């Protein structure tokens, strides 16, 4: 089985794949202060709680936007699985032609999402990822990564409002029934949630115009708060909560032959 690991600024999501089918997945908090031993114990416990054996993992692929965590995490995986994990970056085959001024600047998570979205839904398309940052990525009909937009995530905006405005409380990210609100809490919730709906609709519509194509441009959303925003807009066609994990599985398969050769050599 293949373990795929998506390291984000807020959460680490792990998925276990067998023959490209998701067997199980787990979500843990990203913590740069955790040691490799702590990560090793935590990951092993996740497997045990699910009735799985970590020793069934043949190989591991990681996508990360948090460089400071990689030493501890990679060391933990080497210890648990006895493999050197494949890390998405330069030299890893993705099948995506990146049309960025500096391709190295594109976050691994954005590339992984693009791979999965184009494979599953074709192009042209826009991928919106509601993570710590909200990212919008444009992929052409030929599977080229054209570029995109990065904006503060919904939770970042909510936390900033609480931290910078002395009289405003921290609020739960839920959708109030209207925008003419009668309390401070519901007023903040309406501003955050419906404000983000407006942001998403505007950027998606502007991106579609910049594509300058006649064919339909599909919009695929992923990330923890994608369902919340999707419930208030018509501009999202598909919500795919496992998009990043599937992208990692696909990228692994595109590098499988080379990986198998490396693993065989290391075991010789």
Swiss-Prot record:
This is Type III pantothenate kinase. Homodimer. It catalyses: (R)-pantothenate + ATP = (R)-4'-phosphopantothenate + ADP + H(+). Its EC number is 2.7.1.33. Keywords: ATP-binding, Coenzyme A biosynthesis, Cytoplasm, Kinase, Metal-binding, Nucleotide-binding, Potassium, Transferase. It is an enzyme of class 2 (transferase). One of its GO terms (cellular component) is cytoplasm. It comes from Alkaliphilus metalliredigens (strain QYMF). It holds the Pfam family Pan_kinase. Substrate binds at residues 100, 107-110, 184. K(+) binds at residue 129. A monovalent cation. Ammonium or potassium. Pathway: Cofactor biosynthesis; coenzyme A biosynthesis; CoA from (R)-pantothenate: step 1/5. It is found in: Cytoplasm. GO terms for molecular function: ATP binding; metal ion binding; pantothenate kinase activity. The active site is at 109 (proton acceptor). GO terms for biological process: coenzyme A biosynthetic process. Belongs to the type III pantothenate kinase family. Catalyzes the phosphorylation of pantothenate (Pan), the first step in CoA biosynthesis. Its cofactor is NH4(+); K(+).
């Amino acid at each position: 089985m293949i373990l795929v690991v998506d390291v984000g600024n807020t959460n680490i999501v792990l998925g276990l794949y067998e023959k490209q089918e998701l067997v199980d997945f787990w979500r843990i908090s990203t913590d740069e202060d955790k040691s490799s031993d702590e990560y090793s114990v935590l990951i092993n416990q996740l497997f045990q709680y699910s009735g799985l054996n970590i020793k069934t993992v043949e190989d591991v692929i990681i996508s990360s936007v948090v460089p400071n965590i990689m030493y501890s995490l990679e060391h933990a995986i080497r210890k648990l699985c006895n493999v050197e994990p494949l890390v998405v970056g330069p030299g890893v085959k993705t099948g995506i032609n990146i049309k960025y001024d500096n391709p190295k600047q594109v976050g691994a998570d954005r590339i992984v999402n693009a791979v999965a979205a184009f494979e599953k839904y074709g192009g042209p398309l826009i991928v919106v990822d509601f993570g710590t940052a909200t990212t919008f990525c444009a992929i052409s009909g030929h599977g080229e990564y054209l570029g995109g937009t990065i904006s503060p995530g919904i939770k970042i905006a909510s936390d900033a409002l609480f931290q910078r405005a002395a009289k405003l409380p921290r609020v739960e990210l839920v959708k109030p029934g209207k925008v003419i609100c009668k309390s401070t809490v519901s007023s903040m919730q309406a501003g955050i949630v419906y404000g983000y709906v407006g942001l998403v609709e505007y950027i998606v519509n502007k991106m579609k115009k910049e594509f300058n194509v006649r064919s339909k441009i599909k919009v695929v959303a992923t990330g923890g708060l994608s369902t919340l925003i999707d419930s208030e807009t018509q501009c999202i066609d598909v919500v795919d909560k496992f998009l990043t994990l599937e992208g990692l599985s696909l990228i692994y398969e595109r590098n499988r032959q080379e990986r198998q050769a490396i693993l065989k050599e290391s075991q010789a």
